[in-house]
């Protein structure tokens, strides 16, 4: 029996396994109830009395080494498995969720699509602008309140440079390098020096449109406005134009639509008037055309501008404008079905 034990000791010392399945086969072969070591234990009762001490010590040594070898191989495979699940420090600590389109992007694209079908092309310009394109070229007087630091963000090191207060500056840039017919729509971010509240923000988004050609009339403007209102808010939408003032248009007007919440009957949202203001518009002032190199005696045009937040607010009844810039996924997910 001593010879048999020594043979098994050599085998156990040389045990190898390529994977956990092979290791389980070896465990069964040597350490299970029907394994080789247990068979020797069963034969131990037949050993002569004078050899029992020596054989017993050898059997215990064999069993211990076999168990240690199997455990060592098992630990090796366990470490390999754990290595496959090591902590990835590049992964986010928060669950990664699929994004959705921002409500402002949804409405912006709707507005662009409506005007694109009318033949308008997209024009864009810089958000950091000069005084000429934001004010002077658009007929703003030297003492106009918009030029004051209370309303506009100026660049401290360059007094004539500022964050644009409207996308009308894009219209000026297009007119000074183009000749009519001009038919453009100008979406973009603008900045105003205003206190942040549920009704106002220091930055927001605008879309402005400009059409310049021969014999453009206020009637053309009104038809475009009516079509836009019906496309954006529904076929039953009514519009009304109220006289107003803007430096770059004459005559100027503000456009209201019949309240899309109460159907024009009156509610808290429309202050019980049945009407809600959505944009400003008018015929391009001849001084603006001339300042930008277009002969006002030959050409005329109209312009209109609206806040994207305002239109989104009306479409989806968002009461707090700050929610558009807070990036709260709970709020944004409410618009998944909107596109």
UniProtKB/Swiss-Prot annotation:
The record's InterPro entries line, in alphabetical order, gives:
aa-tRNA-synth_II, aa-tRNA-synth_II/BPL/LPL, Phe-tRNA-synth_IIc_asu, Phe-tRNA_ligase_II_N, Phe_tRNA_ligase_alpha1_bac, Phenylalanyl-tRNA_Synthase, tRNA-bd_arm
Q: Does the keyword Aminoacyl-tRNA synthetase apply?
A: yes
What disulfide bonds does the UniProt entry report for this chain? none
Give GO terms for biological process. phenylalanyl-tRNA aminoacylation
Q: What class of enzyme is it?
A: ligase
Molecular function as annotated in GO? ATP binding; magnesium ion binding; phenylalanine-tRNA ligase activity; tRNA binding
Q: Which cofactor does it need?
A: Mg(2+)
Q: How is the cofactor bound?
A: Binds 2 magnesium ions per tetramer.
Compartment(s) of residence: Cytoplasm
Indicate the principal place this protein occupies in or around the cell: cytoplasm
Q: What is its EC number?
A: 6.1.1.20
| Keyword Transcription regulation in annotation | no
One annotated Gene Ontology cellular component of this protein: cytoplasm
Q: Which UniProt keywords apply?
A: Aminoacyl-tRNA synthetase, ATP-binding, Cytoplasm, Ligase, Magnesium, Metal-binding, Nucleotide-binding, Protein biosynthesis
Its family? Belongs to the class-II aminoacyl-tRNA synthetase family. Phe-tRNA synthetase alpha subunit type 1 subfamily.
What is the protein's quaternary organization? Tetramer of two alpha and two beta subunits.
Q: What is the name attached to this protein's record?
A: Phenylalanine--tRNA ligase alpha subunit
User: Origin organism of this chain?
Assistant: Bacteroides fragilis (strain ATCC 25285 / DSM 2151 / CCUG 4856 / JCM 11019 / LMG 10263 / NCTC 9343 / Onslow / VPI 2553 / EN-2)
